[in-house]
Amino acid sequence: MEVYFSGTIERIIFENPSNFYRILLLEIDDTDAEDFDDFEIIVTGTMADVIEGEDYTFWGQIVQHSKYGEQLQISRYDRAKPTSKGLVKYFSSSHFKGIGLKTAQKIVDTYGENTIDEILQHPEKLEGITGLSAKNREAFVSTLRLNYGTEMVLSKLANYGIPNKLAFQIQDFYKEETLDVVENYPYQLVEDIKGLGFTIADQLAEELGIESQAPERFRAGLVHSLFQACMETGDTYVEARDLLEQTLTLLESSRPVELDPSQVAQELSYLIEEDKVQQIDTKIFDNSLFFAEEGIRSHLVRILEKGKQKSHDLETIQKHITTIEEELGIEYDNIQKQAICDAIQNKVFILTGGPGTGKTTVINGIIAVYALLEGLDFRKKSNLPILLAAPTGRAARRMNELTGLPSATIHRHLGMTGDDDTSHLEDYLDAEFIIVDEFSMVDTWLANQLFSNISSNSKILIVGDSDQLPSVSPGQVLADLLHIPLIPQTRLEKIYRQSKESTIVTLASQIRQGILPADFTQKKADRSYFKIASGHIPATIEKILGAALRNGIPARDIQVLAPMYRGTAGIDAINQLMQDLLNPPQKDQLSFEAPQCHYRKRDKVIHLVNDAEINVFNGDLGAITDLIPGKYTESKQDEIVIDFDGNEVSYPRNEWYKIRLAYAMSIHKSQGSEFPVVILPITSASRRMLERNLIYTAITRAKSKLILLGELQAFDYATQHIGTARKTYLIERFSDLLENVEEKQQAVSETVTSSASEQSYILTEENWDRIPAMIGITDTDLKEIFGK
């Protein structure tokens, strides 16, 4: 419930000028908060300059701080007219360089009432004040205009019901044009301000008198619904009928009014005519996705058709393959040899396959043959004109470990500073041969960015597993490219990387084919299954952790992967449990409170966005090495120091949204990584998330041990459930170069299924009841999991 506190600012405890975050001590004169009988309260939030000793009213929510007790977390505020005494104190503060008490008093005396307004309207009067240099005078007016102008804007936005945090985002984006945009083009905020959404902009528009039937309202609703639908489904377009239905639902839920669908359809036609959205038949595209798909097509065709291709005869390539086999003591099968030949002889080549099928072996063979053909020593990796890239930092480091060649993220190679960066290099990537791994994670936007920066004279090897989860953002680029005959490809099927006792790779292959094997519940050397109800999963994980640690397995080697964040078996709850078990609070040990947890030294954390400037990327895992209170930092904010494999990075409090605990993490975030021990809890509570590629991706993250927890029905459902195929238009864009494109949908959704003769091998519903529930897990059971 929102409450207000009016009173005098007794002290400014903390302030960060870079993001306007402040902590104040307010002496209370009045409040409507029930049962609050203290005479002062801590006030926190984003606000422009405030003056000690002056009167303000703050609105917000009372929250409980673990260390400092009750605080007011503000949503908006208002200040009373400042007093002369308060202004003198404010002008002589550290906010304004070169102004002492005497000069500040002269300024107030010169301008009299409404001092700040008068200064901003008539700054020339400052020239007559002795002791105030031209440089300090200019800086004084500039700072005052910034702070007071910001406050005026915030106050106005607050009157429109926009919370302070969003108001600062709006002010930061539009600068001096803020009020003009807000008051005249409120729906522009939907496109420009991340996190604002349509509803807030629509409420603002209603405040400003924009009618519910206004054309600009319909257009904003259409554009917003289109983009949101693509982000939620992963599709790159929406059918016009579906878009109109979704938009009508949005518009009518935002304001209680019944609308004429034909009017909304008319505005969709307007958006198409004005190139605000794109249309192909009945398909409606967001502009960025439409042109990104078209870009992928045009750049791949450019590379395939226009570049120079060095000619290497097949006999020479085969001779070099034999040389490498002899030197490295390996033997390629015929399919692997053909893959090496095809990758060398083609400008663009796709290599795909599941875990253990030899993708890395083939990649190393391609690199070595390419080096020999160029007259280079393939053992001297630093001399090779080859660029290795991957969508995540962990995947890039893994490429480096497996090939010995330098590797980096796609973002880093392209000089992209963040996920939203759409900048291009001044020149193409400097490499004759570019190898990109984990391509199933590459979305439509990033694929376009990558291909547009590759020279027509470069070769590209695309590597990935199309049966894994597709990219988080729209598109299924790898899956689509695999159905374009113009691009040569090889799928590796035979499993090599598996000892006699290893079963994880075999299980993954069976899951990929939609088979839950009859021995799924049986104890194996490298995997175990425990039938556990959702509510008992935390206690089971606690037992498993204890057993693992007693058997000498380092905590850092154990990773819990889960489908959802919420619930008793969700990521958030498991993270809290594992933090308390593996890194419990210590007496007199510093910890920092964040919205979802308390951070402690030695905590395992994950970075959630791409930050090329600090060389940390989405999915990177690190450990907290230090916690530094704000009074000791340059930013004046509490800072968390995290070590990412030797790269130490400091996170001030306003950047903590980029990290979270990672004892447990989402299956999506685990892509591109491998862990010695994976614990995978799957229950019906996460049914809406369960799909075959989700379980397959999770299982393939386990390197040595896989512990499956949960309900057998949930695992079976996930194995059988393919999920909804993403709707994309990438394959059709190659239609002028291909035949039989109309078979796309059948090709994309084609899956390998088991025959009726295999029924005895599959665990069926009839067999479920024959499996005893793991009501209690004994120490012997647990010891067997990790026994050596």
Q: What residue spans do the PLM features occupy?
A:
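Structural detector for short beta-strands of small beta-barrel domains
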Residues: 1-16, 60, 624-625
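Short aromatic-glycine-enriched beta-strand elements
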Residues: 15-27, 631-641
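Accessory alpha-helical DNA-binding modules that contact the DNA backbone or grooves
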Residues: 23-26, 36-43, 51-59, 63-281
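Walker B catalytic acidic pair
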Residues: 437-438, 464
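C-terminal accessory regions
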Residues: 626-788
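ASCE P-loop NTPase motor cores of helicases and related translocases
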Residues: 255, 278-434, 482-497, 504-531, ...
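Conserved helicase motor core of P-loop NTPases
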Residues: 359, 377-379, 467-606, 611-614, ...
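Short basic/glycine-enriched coil/helix segment immediately N-terminal to the Walker B
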Residues: 419-432, 443, 448-458, 670
